Regions:
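A short beta-loop-alpha structural element at the N-terminal edge
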Residues: 2-14
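Acetyl-CoA-dependent GNAT
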Residues: 8, 33-91, 102-103, 108, ...
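Conserved GNAT-fold acetyl-CoA-binding loop/helix
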Residues: 15-44
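Conserved catalytic-core motifs of GNAT/GCN5-like acyltransferases
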Residues: 68-71, 76, 118-121, 133, ...
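Conserved beta-strand-loop-alpha-helix junction that forms the acyl-donor binding cleft
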Residues: 93, 119-129
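Conserved acetyl-CoA-binding loop-helix of GNAT-fold acetyltransferases
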Residues: 94-107, 129-134
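Conserved GNAT acetyl-CoA-binding A-motif
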Residues: 109-121
Length: 163
């Protein structure tokens, strides 16, 4: 398995993976699937240098999942904070790929001017909670019933890690 930066040629598969979570789960609060063209600005917001990265796991020419570090908030004082996330192709969940992606992502971030990593997790999501805790995140807050999807409201737990 290879972990590498995401590139334009990955856009179709990245979109397919993300759309699974849009359509089937409350993990993301997007409610309508995207086209690759709609996801292109997101891809371009994750260059191969700097604090905002996109790493993909690939095996045998197939994308297994991806991890990102994105801008936490747009105001300048937040520049050294990133929001991290991991999305896996549903057929590859449970293989340890999320951990491999996060290991690589945090190695990259260690070389950047990043002070804090944050992750918002729609709850309940024990697998994501365990992954983040394994990487040194701790829960610092809970926003109750802030996302409406699938005819119910969902809480979001915020996890934080100093880098």
């Amino acid at each position: 398995m290879e972990i590498r930066p995401g590139v334009e040629d990955d856009l179709d598969e990245l979109t397919r993976i993300y759309n699974h979570y849009v359509i089937e789960t409350p993990i993301t609060f997007d409610v309508e699937p995207f086209t690759p063209d709609q996801r292109r600005p997101w891809l371009l917001a994750h260059p191969t240098s700097g604090p905002h990265r996109l790493l993909v796991a690939e095996e045998g020419g197939k994308l297994l999942g991806y991890a990102t570090s994105s801008a936490f908030r747009p105001k300048p004082a937040y520049a050294t904070s990133v929001e991290t996330s991991v999305y896996l192709a549903p057929e590859h969940v449970g293989r340890g790929i999320g951990g491999l992606l996060y290991t690589s992502l945090f190695e990259v971030l260690a070389q950047e001017d990043v002070h804090t990593a944050l992750a918002g997790i729609a709850m309940p999501n024990q697998a994501s909670q365990r992954l983040h805790e394994r990487f040194g995140f701790r829960q610092v807050g809970l926003l109750e019933q802030v996302g409406g999807k699938f005819d119910r409201f969902w809480d979001v737990a915020w996890f934080q890690k100093s880098l």
